[in-house]
């Protein structure tokens, strides 16, 4: 007998709302008691990707998505929902933002492979088998 599960009529990435429907949230700075800075939290995670190839790649057929769809239509949600700040945009050239993937920060939550507009990231199990499959 198969385990029971919820059945959904669409993939989760289809529920990501466009930027026109939302206002930015101004989060308070970490207090060092209940909330901590990113580097402290990454050290506590115990993940280590030193000298490993990236396990996060943009799907070949979706190379245009980060800069054209995610950034322009959705205000780059990957820069906010990723708890390890793996995704950021290099804004040196204002007219051509470039997605930078800091895979060494990844804590293997797989949110990016589930929630990103157009599901443009291919998430593979890192060397050593860390993270969900």
Show the residue positions of the predicted features.
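Ferredoxin-type iron-sulfur electron-transfer modules and their immediate structural context
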Residues: 1-95, 114-133
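Short linker/helix segments within small regulatory modules
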Residues: 93-103
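Flanking scaffold residues of small Cys/His-coordinated metal-binding clusters
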Residues: 73-77, 101-111
């Amino acid at each position: 007998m198969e385990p029971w599960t919820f059945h959904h009529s669409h993939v989760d990435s289809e529920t990501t709302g466009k930027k026109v429907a939302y206002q930015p949230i101004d989060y308070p700075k970490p207090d060092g008691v209940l909330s901590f800075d990113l580097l402290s939290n990454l050290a506590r995670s115990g993940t280590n990707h030193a000298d490993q190839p990236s396990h996060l790649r943009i799907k070949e057929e979706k190379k245009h998505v980060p800069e054209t769809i995610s950034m322009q239509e959705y205000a780059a949600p990957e820069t906010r929902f990723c708890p390890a700040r793996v995704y950021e945009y290099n804004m040196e050239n204002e007219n051509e933002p470039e997605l930078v993937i800091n895979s060494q920060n990844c804590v293997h939550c797989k949110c990016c492979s589930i929630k990103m507009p157009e599901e443009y990231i291919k998430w593979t199990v890192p060397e050593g088998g860390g993270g969900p499959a």
